[in-house]
Design a protein with these regions (language model features):
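N-terminal cap/lid segment of alpha/beta-hydrolase-fold proteins
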Residues: 2-49
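Alpha/beta-hydrolase active-site loop
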Residues: 100-119
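Short beta-strand/loop motif that positions the catalytic acidic residue
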Residues: 210-211, 217-219
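The serine-hydrolase catalytic nucleophile loop
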Residues: 62-75
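Conserved alpha/beta-hydrolase
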Residues: 75-96
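Conserved alpha/beta-hydrolase "acid-adjacent" motif
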Residues: 224-230
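Hydrolase active-site cap/lid region
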Residues: 143-196, 213
């Protein structure tokens, strides 16, 4: 298979590793199905020496991007278990467009997955955090059979949740003009001003459609954004198919995922994707 990104000229070329012949690190742009340029990074990780290793595609949380230290730390940890692809969602970092806070971002993930498979990996798993977790769940439901395992960390179960102070602040950031200015200039995140129309499939509606693809739901019992009814609702919706890890003392998303947890997620993804 070709390892060139579809629909866009690469900013950097793929160079094989001198010892293994496998591709070295690549940083480039893809174009999504709706024409948005998305920055993406490929790291061969453990796949340099293990041709059977999977590629793990990481979907970051809201306000993240490929250069955020917490995103890079997670990517480095997961690279011990396979190749890694990270990308900046639309409206984040150097990607184009504006964030739709989980709706059109499914197209960003789809482009990254297609590109990741182009490097010749037989297995691919998605690992999403917070907003990115909702995206990997919806993608797996909408495009069955395109991934081999799905891990969702700190995902909401339902839309429009305002039951915690951090989520009330996030809704102000997204829905108010002054909030979007803070997002643009303070958080390097450009947010679309339009409401969802139609309202996308919610994570809890997506989960029953994912089986038989292996599904992992990870959530901290000190998550300040989404309390424990969210992961429990997701697990219940799976009808017993999903694995649920409730992590003692863990907060929210990448910032709260310590190295030991990242290792466990990487090990799970490598085992369950094949």
């Amino acid at each position: 298979m070709s390892n060139r990104p579809a629909g866009h000229v690469a900013r950097s070329t793929v160079r094989p590793d001198d010892e293994t012949g496998r591709p070295g690190p690549v940083r480039t742009y893809l174009r999504t199905a709706d024409g948005v340029p998305v920055e993406v990074v490929y790291d061969p990780g453990a796949a340099v020496y293990d041709p059977d290793a999977p590629v793990l595609v990481i979907a970051h949380g809201f306000t993240g991007d490929v250069d955020r230290p917490h995103v890079r730390r997670v990517a480095a940890g997961l690279a011990r278990y396979g190749a890694v692809v990270i990308f900046s969602f639309r409206g984040h970092g150097r990607s184009g467009g504006r964030s739709t806070v989980g709706d059109k971002e499914v197209l960003d993930l789809a482009a990254a997955l297609a590109w990741a498979r182009g490097f010749g990996h037989a297995r691919v798993a998605t690992v999403g955090f917070s907003m990115g977790a909702s995206v990997v769940l919806r993608h797996a439901a909408l495009h069955p059979g395109t991934v081999d395992a799905v891990a969702a960390v700190s995902s909401p179960a339902r839309w429009y949740y305002r039951g915690t102070a951090p989520m009330r602040r996030l809704h102000w950031l997204v829905t108010r003009p002054e909030g979007r200015l803070v997002g643009r200039y303070g958080l390097r995140t450009r947010i679309h001003h339009r409401d969802w129309d139609p309202i996308p499939l919610s994570p809890v509606e997506a989960v029953p459609l994912i089986a038989p693809t292996p599904l992992l739901i990870v959530h901290g019992d000190r998550d300040g954004y989404f309390p424990l009814d969210h992961p429990r609702m997701l697990a219940d919706a799976s009808g017993g198919h999903a694995e649920l890890w409730l992590e003692p003392g863990m907060g929210h998303a990448e910032h709260a995922a310590d190295d030991a947890l990242v290792d466990r997620i990487g090990d799970w993804a490598a085992r369950r994707s094949g």
